[in-house]
């Protein structure tokens, strides 16, 4: 979950596919850039993304790696890129002959988490991971601390002590309430962007998607992002 640069525009929804019929592996990413209503909303979302795909206890590891043996390192991503703003998603590199199966499973994991079908133990472990990660950032990542400082005090430094409210909000997350709140915490799947690199085109996914862009070879990803954004802005 390294720091990344803020994208120049809001990510559209839909599917972007760079087809490669000769590839043996396919990279799948499903996610978005999300603005949060509050810092506690951000901390709750971070906890649920940790539950979905962070480490050996996550749903992605259990289902995609252990049960399906389809990917060595399926994972979730949650990178803060501004005040109450984060780049988040799920990713996996899988065999090209079964990418569409795992693609559907990744949506199942997102949807089940969003519907609150989550274990209490798993949520507690994920919340602990969020807290430990914040503490680690404070100790070992001065660039992370500087960015959070500038978000809170863009014009001048405080006269008193610095209070990083995100840490307080993360401690205030009520794990026992997450399952009931999950449907309002995570984005509706129709609002996510899917990026698929490699493998053959799946006609069903192309047909079912209201927003589909086949990325031409040698074109940057921005080509499809702008195309989808333009179409959706006209709706």
Language-model features and meaning:
Residues 76, 195-234:
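Non-catalytic accessory/interaction domains
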Residues 2-59, 222-235:
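His/Glu-based metal-binding/catalytic segments typifying zinc-dependent metallopeptidases
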Residues 173-185:
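A short, acidic, amphipathic alpha-helical segment used as a generic capping/interface helix at domain edges
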């Amino acid at each position: 979950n390294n720091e990344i640069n803020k994208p120049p525009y809001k990510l559209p929804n839909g599917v972007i596919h760079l087809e490669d019929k000769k590839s043996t592996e396919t990279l799948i990413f499903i996610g978005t850039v999300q603005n949060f209503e509050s810092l506690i909303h951000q901390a709750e979302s971070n906890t649920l993304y940790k539950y979905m795909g962070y480490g050996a206890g996550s749903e992605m590891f259990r289902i995609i790696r252990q049960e399906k043996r389809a990917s060595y390192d399926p994972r979730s991503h949650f990178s803060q890129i501004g005040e109450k703003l984060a780049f988040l998603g799920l990713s996996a590199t899988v065999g090209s002959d079964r990418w569409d199966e795992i693609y559907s499973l990744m949506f199942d994991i997102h949807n089940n988490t969003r519907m609150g079908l989550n274990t209490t133990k798993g949520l507690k472990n994920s919340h602990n991971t969020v807290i430990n990660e914040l503490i680690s950032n404070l100790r070992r990542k001065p660039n992370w601390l500087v960015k959070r400082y500038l978000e809170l005090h863009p014009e001048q430094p405080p006269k008193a002590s610095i209070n990083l409210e995100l840490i307080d909000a993360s401690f205030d997350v009520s794990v026992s309430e997450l399952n009931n709140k999950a449907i309002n915490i995570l984005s509706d799947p129709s609002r996510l962007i899917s990026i698929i690199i490699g493998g053959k085109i799946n006609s069903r996914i192309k047909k079912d998607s209201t927003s589909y862009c086949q990325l031409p070879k040698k074109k940057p990803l921005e080509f499809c992002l702008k195309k989808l954004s333009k179409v959706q802005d006209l709706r």
